[in-house]
Amino acid sequence: MYFILSDKLMKRIYLPIMLWALICCTENKKNTESTEVSQEASKESKKASDTKEQIKAKPKTGSTDGMIHFDGGSIIIGSESGMPDEQPPFEKIIEPFYLDKNLVTVGDFRKFIQATGFKTDADKFGDSGVFDFEQGNWNLMKGANWEYPLGPQMPKAEENHPVTHVSWNDAQAYATWAGKRLPTEFEWEYAAKNGKNTTDKYAWGNQLIVKGRYMANVWQGESVTEPEVLDGFMLTSPVGAFGEHPSGLTDMGGNVWQWCANTYAGYPGSPTAGQKDEAVKSARGGSFMYDQAEDASFTTTFRSKNTTDTSLFNTGFRCAM
């Protein structure tokens, strides 16, 4: 059985796309490695169509309404004390850009689907990744998609919650339709740090709980099969429910993992620098889901990755310009 989302019971699951740090605790037919969950189409008919062919409506000219502007400049990316793939830190010049204040919601994504007739990867495959809290493993749930995150037999997703069960391909298609794009993970980190070389761990400061209040929708519980609901949400929460960060952004830690534009690769100077697979993209931010990295997954520097056709119930995105 799956814990049902209610606006007062929604809580966590980790699997960064997001499974860079978690997935070793489950066996999933989507896994291509112990740290990735991927969907492999068994028939040619299941392969993703070209995004341009799927988007029937003419892409809009992007609007910066609801976006935060960042001036850009020099920033130190990564962490000396973080996970191996966050090292070594290096200087990066970021050009000026805009980033959505909020995650793309179910309501936002519905407008895209209605305007274009787009079919997501989850709909093409007929299933998507959902975590079974009782059994303690990931499953491909038939019929789970952006509209029915726990399957068609369960309630629809709330319109003001972040859209989930969207692959990198799906996020790219939405961004193109909206006249925007996905942020690079370096832009994402710059924004999470509010453009400053700060020592703060998170986008809001150094503590997950401030004056008795949780600052983000994050996992509470001793293990992945023993969730507690101390922040008010069992699974996803409405976008912005935990307030704005100093940058003006919301949900830059927890709630859902966020797809980034770039291919995942080792940082300059690392043993894996230059090694990459174009089918594996970066993701940032952590989610409501349990993570073996624990609180580290919500930091501004933590990295995750997954394949472009993977969709999960704790993965979403926001757009940039």
Give the positions of each predicted feature:
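Short, surface-exposed loop and linker segments with low hydrophobicity and enrichment for Pro/Ser/Thr
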Residues: 14, 94-97, 275-276
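Low-complexity, intrinsically disordered short segments enriched for Gly/Pro and polybasic residues
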Residues: 1, 16, 224, 306-309
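Extended beta-strand/loop cores of jelly-roll/beta-sandwich
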Residues: 6, 25-186, 306-321
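Functional-site microenvironments in short loops/helix caps that host divalent-cation chemistry
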Residues: 70, 76, 81, 119, ...
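Mature extracytoplasmic/luminal segments of secretory-pathway proteins
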Residues: 21-22, 202, 257, 316
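Short alpha-helical segments used as structural interaction elements across diverse proteins
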Residues: 8-9, 281, 300, 315
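Sec-dependent N-terminal signal peptides
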Residues: 14-21
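Positively charged n-region of N-terminal signal peptides that target proteins for export
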Residues: 2-13
